[in-house]
Amino acid sequence: MLTAVAALNLSPRVNALTWLQVLERARGQTVDWFMWGGFPSTNAYVNGYVVPRVKELYGVKLRQVPVKDIAEVISKILVEKQAGKNEGGEIDLMWINGENFRTCKKNDLLYGPFADRLPNQKLVDWTRPSVHNDFGEPVQGLESPWGSAQAVMIYDSRRIPQPPQTMAELLDWIRQHPGRFAYPAPPDFTGSVFVRHIFYHVSGDAAAWQGEFDEKRFDDAANKTYLLLKDIAPSLWRQGMTYPENPIRLAHLLADGEVDFAISYHPAEASKMIHDGLYPDTVRTFVFKEGTISNTHFVAIPFNAAAKEGAMVVADFLISPEAQLKKADPEVWGDFPAIDIQRLDKTWQEKFNTLPRGIATLSDKELQTHQLPEPPSEILIRLEKGWDEHVLKGR
């Protein structure tokens, strides 16, 4: 299932333990979970459900440490690594994926492999491309999945009865309706995924970028991407002179009628915001005919975490049927499962299958038949830097 890892950060003290011993060591530990804290539903799920449940079930005190950018946390761990601080680190668990995982792996900042030791890992389909590889980087047991995502476009059907069906149609719509479209500034993850969709649009084939990196070919497609983004900038909200800082700000722009579309990595987010009263019940979502980018998000344990056992217990609980069902509830978060529902017994399968479907949430079939892979993290990093240099500073 999980391939060998060249450089390991296995703690003999932890690695030699049975799972029962891990549970015993974890009891009484405090686990500090560093994660992006900008989405209220995620924060409510973690603090209102996960925190009390791991305390009740395992005696683990879990503390969410919200951050604006997990890259800053990675930088802190790197400094500790360079300073030789191999034990007693401040960070026990991280919500990461993509370029941050690549950075951690490249610099040997993660404990593990540990994912294959979690009892609930048997519920995960490790052969699924977005689980086996994180933005093109082999996971190799150094991360444990806890959710899946797919980009969707959000719109108010009362204002836009027939939304664009392709990226080309959306670009035409933007030019014809100046000031009515915005996307968050990269490296915000929703702004970044919009840029990657443009990249796929101008290059013509998402699958072609899954292989070996071609510098010349990338430069050609990237330059076309920046030119197109600069071309539409004057037609954006506030003439492209400023960009929303995050998806929450963009959601409020849509709710306030300042723009006509929003972007989300969570297909059920619009339904949740209708439930919470931010969006009217006429809001809906769509995906492009050519597809939208999907991925998996993970948790990882730093090499010098002070509470490795507790972090493993939390990671295992996050992929339990109970925790995954709660997270998938559109009235809680609506984040899609990281586990393979078909691996559950019929009772649990029925619970997942009878979850209420939010009014604005697309069917599983619609989403799954319109999935595009993430490009390798090398492309993501370069596109984000290029956007800043050529689009933002090139205004």
Task: Show which residues each predicted segment covers.
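Mature extracytoplasmic/periplasmic domains
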Residues: T292, H297, I301-L367
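Extracytoplasmic ligand-binding site segments that recognize negatively charged/polar headgroups
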Residues: W36-Y49, V65-I74, E87, I91-I248
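Short beta-strand->loop
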Residues: Y111-L123, E143, L171, H275, ...
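A ligand-binding cleft/hinge motif common to bilobed small-molecule-binding domains
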Residues: F101-T103, I263-P280
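Short, polar/charged alpha-helical segment
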Residues: W19-R27, F34-K61, M153
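Conserved C-terminal helix/tail region of periplasmic/extracytoplasmic solute-binding proteins
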Residues: H252, I359-R395
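Periplasmic-binding protein-like
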Residues: G136, A149, L228-I232, Y243, ...
